[in-house]
Design a protein with these regions (language model features):
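Alpha-helix C-terminal capping/helix-to-coil transition sites in glycosyltransferase folds
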Residues: 2-3, 48, 175-178
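Short N-terminal targeting/anchoring amphipathic segment
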Residues: 2-13
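Glycosyltransferases and closely related glycan-assembly transferases
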Residues: 3, 16-29
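Short, Asp-centered acidic motifs that coordinate Mg2+ and/or phosphate
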Residues: 4-6, 29, 51, 181
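Short acidic active-site motifs
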Residues: 17, 171-172, 193
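Active-site-proximal region of nucleotide-activated glycan assembly enzymes
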Residues: 25-90
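Conserved catalytic-core segment of nucleotide-activated headgroup transferases in glycan assembly
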Residues: 76-168, 175-177
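Catalytic binding pocket for nucleotide-activated donors in carbohydrate/polymer assembly enzymes
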Residues: 177, 181, 185-254
Length: 254
């Protein structure tokens, strides 16, 4: 009754979703975008949404058949970002309990994105580079204890894993400047977190998957012509991170 022309859902199948408003909008173009990284599927044998916003990297042409929606392709990356996302950093490593001379790998994804395969790769890097530390987001005590215990069982001192407390968003974005490399997760990449890192000029090493949520960091890197940081398997992921660690000139050029 509100005569809405275009309805864009930014939540999808997430908390407080109102996705099923869409079928009630009879003369409205409906679009699935951003909040839910994937197809919303069918309702009563019809697509729940008319369109999904994507790009050529996120949804390769051969994968269109897996989406109920028609694909609207943006020219660079499906995720737009503002130019002034960069934040001045007014703190130092000691403020966050990080040794000043450490090489800092960060991964500010939520803990549920950390799989055993990815975490093992991170531990491989910690073992390879004794002066490095891993800086993660503090999610909850269970995740913190499990990750630390797993590291200890695999011969890595858990004190080399430092957990970042939650802080205001501006400070969170700014503290990326204290890290050297952002290590991505799979099968659920960094999304907004990847944009935060790139805004602060931190290189991201990602492992490209086959699904929407596993290709987001790759999409952002591809749009910046940083395809060298998009890897195909866990071995090349470790190799890419190692090159960035060892070659400071290459890292600065990136």
């Amino acid at each position: 009754n509100d005569e809405i022309d275009i309805f864009i859902d930014l939540t999808g199948y997430t908390n407080n979703s109102r996705a099923f408003i869409a079928p009630e909008l009879k003369n409205t173009t409906t679009i699935n975008w951003l909040g839910y990284p994937g197809s919303m599927g069918l309702t009563q044998e019809k697509p729940l949404y008319d369109f999904i916003l994507a790009d050529d990297f996120i949804i390769p042409e051969n994968d269109e058949k897996y989406y109920a929606e028609s694909i609207l392709r943006l020219p660079f990356a499906y995720q737009p970002n503002i130019e002034n996302r960069y934040q001045l950093n007014h703190k130092n490593r000691q403020d966050y309990g990080i040794p000043s001379d450490a090489f800092v790998y960060c991964a500010f994804n939520q803990s549920f994105k950390i799989t055993e395969v990815i975490f093992k790769a991170w531990l491989t890097l910690l073992e390879k580079y004794p002066k490095s530390i891993l800086w993660l987001t503090e999610s909850n005590s269970w995740a913190t204890n499990n990750l630390k215990n797993y590291a200890e069982r695999h011969g890595i001192n858990s004190e080399r894993i430092i957990f970042a407390k939650r802080v205001p968003n501006e400070e969170h974005i700014a503290r990326h400047a204290l890290a050297d490399i952002y290590l991505d997760t799979l099968p659920y990449n960094a999304h907004t977190s990847a944009s935060d890192a790139l805004a602060m000029n931190i290189p991201i090493v990602t492992l490209k998957g086959k699904t929407f949520p596993s290709r987001v960091a790759g999409s952002l890197l591809h749009s910046l012509n940083l395809d060298d940081l998009i890897t195909e398997d866990i071995e090349s992921y470790i190799k890419c991170a190692s090159k960035l660690t060892e070659d400071s000139t290459y890292r600065q050029d990136i």
